């Protein structure tokens, strides 16, 4: 397939994903059952979703309802279910937060299997069972900004147009909460360009012109030009050092 043909197919496919505000709101409403919704699976299949920045587990999903109840008891407010939210400007980006509160908050819940029997949060930290967060100077939980969970929640806030995220780590013995602010500069400087390149050059070509499915060989999937160029440059540098 020529580059021109591939580019035209990319543009047509992106256009097919675009929805007006009414369409985006309708999908969010229809997909609040998440994994139990056929529409949820269909609409997210061809999009890059923020959950891909994290690692979901069966244990975590099964424990989420319990964590939501714990959060509601702590905050004294209702956590509402949320369907698939599609980005207004980039229709191939989407998110499904674990919950939303009013107009300003998303909720992201982690129930790591590794801490299921930890008596306290501090014990889990000291035993190095929670590698994605640490204790800050005030002794409170703090999500590491270089961890993919941080990218996930920033993506959730941006796509859903909310200012804050309640990041919750829950076990049967304790619940820890961190209120994370939306960081527009982090999104602009660390995320959006990389997400666009990954989708347009890695994911989208495989969606519209699958190579892996023909012979089920990973070698059939061609790396994007910029990656091939970087590999070539790196190899040249190694050769020059010999």
What would you call each of these model-derived segments?
Residues 1-242:
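Accessory terminal regions of nucleic-acid processing enzymes
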